């Protein structure tokens, strides 16, 4: 009898513990930031679009404010569209907000956990970041990499001059060749180079799969693993296609780098030192697996190829629609460079309007309109609201860039917004004054893009050389009428967590015969003095 009483007492105690935990959970949920009402059990999952989630998140931000929350089943998500909170959470509380949400697709199927973008905040993450920072820090870019940047952007001018109808490909070749040369010592000499085509095909599918809402939420509802994948958009097959493509491409360049090192050592051949040389020298000491080395090079190949090329294509769109901006930029360029030399990195301090155009391009149509989500690794309170451990936290780049209180008429392309802000993006990202932040395309906090220093210099040189060399205007139809360039955020750009302009027509013409002559002369010198130091595929 006593045993029965003890059992009943224990059961009551357990029930009280469960009820208390449930009550505490309910009480804390009531203290979450405001947000859209959801359905029982599933939360807001049916309200989330499969594409362009940044548009929905920005719509909700106008209703619920700079910090709001929503539910995906039992999981909590929060969206930050407030400059002060970006600084407070991602920078000042970066130790709490630097992890990544669990991603079965990204971490298990595609990368085996070795991709820096989806890697959790850990010792391996810090190791990867340190390796990248050492090779792509500002001083290395200034001392070593700028020479290659100038040479590749000089070829880009030559390519635009000879084949203006392929403008959508020239920027991709340029940025891909820059990063391939720095990573592996192998150039991308033309737009039809196989490794470039393969990378962009992989990147397109990877971007679509990793967009918020694009795959079933198996991390939250594990039972979805048992639902036939053909009912859910063949998400496993698509993920495995990306995994195979990445592994094949990234490991092939890993092997080529090893072969090139052996050949150089056996023949005493001179070759440009690369990022992978540094990694291979330390691989055994650091305990890096071959798969980790593959993805160290691969993640930089992705980031270095896609962001810069897309932003240059966006800039050309805007320039073609705004001849007055071209006119002001050329007045500045002509005063500094004349027509017998193109701009170099040394001209940066004297070309502030070019830098303003770059900043406005990144603000206007950001390539990452919804930065890759962060995860909270500990319970936190923000302005009286509770965010539980494990909350997925989105940095709403699109919403920040199109905040009418900060950027009046945000859909208008207007470089003068950045009058007086002539430093590079890193300086403003590191500034304690969050109102001075120019844009958020590189992310925030400890997850700030490690390629920011290279990207900023490359973007400036690409913009400066193209504006110095060419006139841009909409193409014309058979009747001489301008063909519309679609810059609508929905119809004019691709889907995915990385967005790119859809193909558009544009007339590109050299500004004068003297400019054309200078382009060819400078390319000949760049080819013999710089580009020839790197291997051909």
From Swiss-Prot:
Alphabetized UniProt keyword annotations: Heme, Iron, Metal-binding, Monooxygenase, Oxidoreductase, Signal
Disulfide-bonded cysteines: none
Top-level lineage group: Eukaryota
Top EC class for this record: oxidoreductase
Enzyme Commission number, as recorded: 1.-.-.-
Residues annotated as binding heme: 449
Biotechnological exploitation: Yanuthone D is an antibiotic against C.albicans, methicillin-resistant S.aureus (MRSA), and vancomycin-resistant Enterococcus.
Required cofactor(s): heme
PANTHER family per the UniProt record, alphabetical: CYTOCHROME P450 MONOOXYGENASE ALNH-RELATED, P450, PUTATIVE (EUROFUNG)-RELATED-RELATED
Name of protein: Cytochrome P450 monooxygenase yanC
Organism: Aspergillus niger (strain ATCC 1015 / CBS 113.46 / FGSC A1144 / LSHB Ac4 / NCTC 3858a / NRRL 328 / USDA 3528.7)
Higher taxonomy: Eukaryota, Fungi, Dikarya, Ascomycota, Pezizomycotina
